[in-house]
A protein has these predicted regions:
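Conserved ABC ATPase "signature" region
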Residues: 59-63, 105-122, 173-174
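Conserved ABC ATPase signature
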Residues: 126-130, 134
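Conserved ABC ATPase "signature" C-loop
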Residues: 205-206
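ABC-type ATPase nucleotide-binding domains, specifically the catalytic core motifs of the NBD
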Residues: 88-107, 116
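ABC ATPase "signature
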Residues: 210-211, 219
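ABC ATPase NBD coupling module
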Residues: 60-76, 100-103, 216-220
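A short, proline-enriched helix->beta-strand linker immediately N-terminal to the Walker B motif
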Residues: 145-149
Length: 237
């Protein structure tokens, strides 16, 4: 379980949030500038909170005298821009994050994750040749290949066309249901609520309301909250 209760002032933004994510998917929804990506940077360890506590599976990652480095937090991260290396092919990009493994094992491990995600055909493709959806699959494979205990995704579908967005949402939902990792997705798109077991709606650095998708649809705290809860989930085969 990923748990966080932190406060951080970032320029004009006062960021304060209290979240607990078990083996489920939490979608943090809100407009651009709400503080969603800043929240992810705090959880990852890229930005140090002013106060509070962050823990993962009972292990303290941040507290008054503890600040575990990002590379040791066992949190997978899929950035909005994918952060893939254009001079490497698909399997090399996935293997890049596996420096903790012996060199001879890295490609085999990366290839296994591409296979699991139905992306083995991308192993020897150059990044410039790939669509946004294909880049997203590689970024997800790279994050999961490190076998994290929690997964964070920053606007994972923002740069995709509507067709690719629907396909990737369905694929990611199936994968998250299979692995049962604590997963936190931030998004400004109300349609991404279909991925959620729970939704938290954020504005100006604060969580306004959080609960199950059914709870927020049934009793939203405001019209603003209601605008970020999608209609009934799409079903997938």
């Amino acid at each position: 379980m990923l748990e966080a209760r932190v406060v951080k002032r970032l320029g004009a933004l006062d960021l304060a949030f209290d979240l607990s994510v078990g083996p489920e998917t939490l979608v943090v929804a809100g407009p651009n500038g709400a503080g969603k990506s800043s929240m992810l940077r705090v959880l990852l360890g890229a930005v140090r909170p002013d106060s509070g506590r962050i823990s993962l599976d009972g292990r303290t990652l941040f507290a008054a005298r503890i600040d575990v480095p990002p590379e040791d937090r066992l949190i997978g991260y899929v950035p909005q821009d994918y952060a893939l290396f254009p001079h490497l092919d698909g399997i090399e990009n996935v293997a890049f994050g596996l420096a903790h493994l012996p060199r001879r094992e890295r490609r085999a491990h990366a290839g296994a994750w591409l296979e699991r995600l139905g992306a083995a055909h991308l192993a020897h493709r150059r990044i410039a040749e790939l669509s946004g959806g294909e880049c997203q699959r590689l970024a997800l494979a790279r994050a999961l290949a490190r076998e994290p205990r929690a997964l964070l995704l920053d606007e994972p579908f923002a740069s995709l066309d509507p067709s690719a967005r629907r396909e990737l949402r369905a694929s990611l939902r199936r994968s998250l249901q299979q692995w049962r990792l604590p997963a936190l997705i931030v998004s400004h798109d109300p349609d991404d609520a279909m991925l959620a077991d729970r939704i938290a709606v954020m504005e100006r650095g604060r969580i306004l309301q959080q609960g199950s998708t059914a709870e927020l649809r049934r009793a939203p705290a405001s019209a603003f909250v209601a605008s970020f809860t999608a209609p009934e989930r799409e079903t997938s085969s």
